[in-house]
Amino acid sequence: MSQRKYFGTDGVRGEVGGPVINAAFALRLGYAAGRVLAREHREHASGRGRNRPQVVIGKDTRISGYMLESALEAGLSAAGIDVLLAGPVPTPAVAYLTRTLRLAAGIVISASHNPYQDNGIKFFSAHGMKLPDDIEAAIEQALDEPLGCVGSEELGRARRMADAQGRYIEFCKSTFPHDLDLNGLKLVVDAAHGAAYNVAPHVFRELGAEVHAIGVSPDGFNINKGVGALHPESLAEEVRARGADLGIALDGDADRLQMVDGTGRIYNGDELLYAIVRERMQRGPVAGVVGTLMTNYGLERQLQQIGVGFERANVGDRYVLEQMQARGWLYGGESSGHLLCLDCHTTGDGTIAALQVLTALRRADATLAEWVADLRMYPQKMINVPLAPGLDWKTHDGLARARGAVEAELAGRGRVLIRASGTEPKLRLMVEAEDEALAQASAQKLADSLGA
């Protein structure tokens, strides 16, 4: 595929008012996407159903969402596309609505876990998955063409969805077994002042839990600020203070999950993924799990011990999903809390992932600590080394020798990961080992080989 000009691995993202996150670009993007979707609709229309394609737009709670939503709506309408405005809903809700309403595409306005100063726009296909590469490429090409407008009789209509949140709440609940409930469970749910603020608490409450909700007072500027999956320590304090059984933390667009138990212990994506997979194994065989380059070595070892395959993808839920689809596997995720259960949904969903963890705990009548007790997480040490101009670390003899020595010493008791930073001229040296001292010494040995 040719180099992308506008789209990154997760749509278009940047600072509000910058080159791509502004009203003018969003208008052009809406028109370009509309033209491509209209063409696809004409080429694949069966002669039945809607005369023109429909698209749903959902957003998180950033103040800039109003501006971008209006601009996208105008561009899509100018291209002859009908628009459904879902308002503030989680990213995975847009994927669900697109699929269940048989729409041409879904559009999400969100910068996920970033602060309010940033925003982004990404698309879902009619199947609730990422757009095919050829469609993204066609939209990029159309972006460089002049802005136009269809005839007045062909303009798209727009209407607000009154039931978007309610539909999604029911979908989430449908992924929790009908023979179970959450009666007697005391939860703290942190929605990060984000897209799930009026959704997630209802899901758990309607299943029977006693819910105390935090991070549910968005003002356009406080999304992810000191709350949510990026700051689970806030949730841990609230769980302890209220004597709750568990805490559930989502990020700004609710596709990421962290959990906390009654003692205040924080559980990351690797531990929660294991909790889900262990329960699924009691229903039948699990062929394999996809993690990333950053997935803890302890999860890899534990999965191997219980007979589950494990593969690493590049960092990013897009790459995890691609590898899951290529292998036909159902489960995958990232340490950050992006968890994919393709037997429940087509994309990562923090609320649904939490329900799958709760399913495991209710079935086993166990605490979270008890359920993942056999998963031993390996201590991790990372050292960032500045890269001298012109230095090719991949062919550096000293680093190669040090890496060989470290890997020989670890010999199945840990792993080494060396990768260049994508944002600054630094080399990231990461070692995971059975004990912290060994991880520290091994990482330092790698750094010393570069004169750091």
Curated annotation (Swiss-Prot):
Co-factor(s): Mg(2+)
PROSITE patterns: PGM_PMM
EC identifiers of the protein: 5.4.2.10
GO molecular function annotations of the record: magnesium ion binding; phosphoglucosamine mutase activity; phosphomannomutase activity
Cofactor binding mode and count: Binds 1 Mg(2+) ion per subunit.
Coiled coil residues, start to end: none
Residue numbers binding Mg(2+): 112, 251, 253, 255
Highest rank taxon of the organism: Bacteria
Record field: catalytic activity: alpha-D-glucosamine 1-phosphate = D-glucosamine 6-phosphate
Modified residues (Phosphoserine): 112
Catalytic EC class: isomerase
UniProt cross-references to HAMAP family, sorted A to Z: GlmM_B
NCBIfam families recorded: glmM, PRK10887.1
Family: Belongs to the phosphohexose mutase family.
Protein name per the record: Phosphoglucosamine mutase
Organism: Bordetella parapertussis (strain 12822 / ATCC BAA-587 / NCTC 13253)
